[in-house]
């Protein structure tokens, strides 16, 4: 458990959409979206691997829809920005291999029900949600600001502000905390792929000027004179993306969530339809935790939900303030049980999860971005939670 007394540092990282693991995540979720758009009841478990000049898709899919998998892959890669074979990965020329089977009937019989309200969980496991009052979107400060840097790094590449940047990149932010509260940014790390001709001096100047300062100066935590800044510290990052590292779906689960703050059940999200509680349960956990904090019941909240395959009701539910509230965890947990139906069908219905919304979630965090598609970021249950906690 993270200490809440004294001074300490906490660090989180983010990657851009051109990072090979994120390329894989986006392809998996692009396939999911194409199928959900045609058939909202699609069962999808789509895994992707990308490497030099090649993308491989495998998994289990049962659907009434159709996906032109090579075209989905190429469109996604093109949108990310791998548009030249010199990068080792080019949307026009990369090979696309696929191996797709139907969902196992053994799993399907545990999930499908004549009464859809009693739909069983698609797997066993535990999922976590987290929220805290460190940022306006109730996310931990380190991951929030790391994602802001990654998004800006991509933006200045795509709009041509810094024309020598390439798609792959990573950011990292370390915060100093005092008695559990973030007080300043202690150090920042940015690594970005770049064109062959770009000099280290030009890269450092561009990242400081166009990425770090515009993003972090408004935060209130950043003093450049009192912050270590590390930019492309190997001195060269020309070979990147799937040419530099093999990318796989589901290998960035910490930055997909809370940057290491709070717990993680281990399940990845991308490529999975809402019947997979790895995804829908974690989204519901975030929704609950965010509403608990927004309701003023606790400045920090962690929710755990656990399921058994084929069983609709969770086998356990916990809502804890991690010692940050005068309201007991027992009261918080009972309030959550009173307000929210945590059966998979009702999670999907409440959050309207059977929509083609997932490709947007596949990079820069599934949580903490308050866009219309992300229903789990709403705070529309605060009144119900306050009333339940008073009972």
Curated annotation (Swiss-Prot):
Coiled-coil stretches: none
Places the protein is found: Cytoplasm
Keyword Magnesium found: yes
Cofactor, free-text remark: Binds 2 divalent ions per subunit.
Pathway(s) annotated for this protein in UniProt: Amino-acid biosynthesis; S-adenosyl-L-methionine biosynthesis; S-adenosyl-L-methionine from L-methionine: step 1/1
Cofactor: Mg(2+); K(+)
Cellular compartments per GO CC: cytoplasm
Molecular-function GO terms, alphabetical: ATP binding; magnesium ion binding; methionine adenosyltransferase activity
Binding site for ATP: 19, 168-170, 236-237, 245, 251-252, 268, 272
GO biological process, one term: one-carbon metabolic process
Binding site for K(+): 47
Swiss-Prot/TrEMBL catalytic activity: L-methionine + ATP + H2O = S-adenosyl-L-methionine + phosphate + diphosphate
Keywords recorded for this protein, A-Z: ATP-binding, Cytoplasm, Magnesium, Metal-binding, Nucleotide-binding, One-carbon metabolism, Potassium, Transferase
Nucleus listed as a keyword: no
The EC number(s) this enzyme carries: 2.5.1.6
PANTHER family the UniProt entry points to: S-ADENOSYLMETHIONINE SYNTHETASE
Subunit field text: Homotetramer; dimer of dimers.
Name assigned to this protein: S-adenosylmethionine synthase
Species of provenance: Oleidesulfovibrio alaskensis (strain ATCC BAA-1058 / DSM 17464 / G20)
Phylogenetic lineage: Bacteria, Pseudomonadati, Thermodesulfobacteriota, Desulfovibrionia, Desulfovibrionales
The gene coding this protein: metK
